[in-house]
Amino acid sequence: MAFAGAPTSASTPSLFLNTAGTGTGTASPVGFAFNPAMTVAYIADNRSSSSGGGIQRFNWNGAGWVYAYTLAYTLSSSKQVWELAADFSGASPVLYATTGESSANNVVCVTDTGSASAFTILATAPTGDAFRGIAFAPTP
């Protein structure tokens, strides 16, 4: 039995953010960010790009969340997007994330101008080290 607000398909508006149906395999959401108006949500899904992983965008339509598209991390087929922070201060959101290697992973960014937006590597951790999260900090 479905409960009120539960999605019935990938394109059905939902009161819940549900990454099921956004690719193949089991969805694996690991980080998220909402714009200040709570009308746009980004979910970092650590599946490979070929399986639907990347940064998924959802839009609030007034009744529920609707999947828009996935920003696929294609700089490496073996790397996935993990943690997530977003800057909504400009005309287009700028998203920052870490990748999922256990050593020598990356901090990446992408400006969301649509589903074909390209990622840029900002930093690579030294061998034996890894970035484990990402967040904004105020300047002193």
Residue map of PLM features:
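Beta-propeller fold recognition
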Residues: 1-140
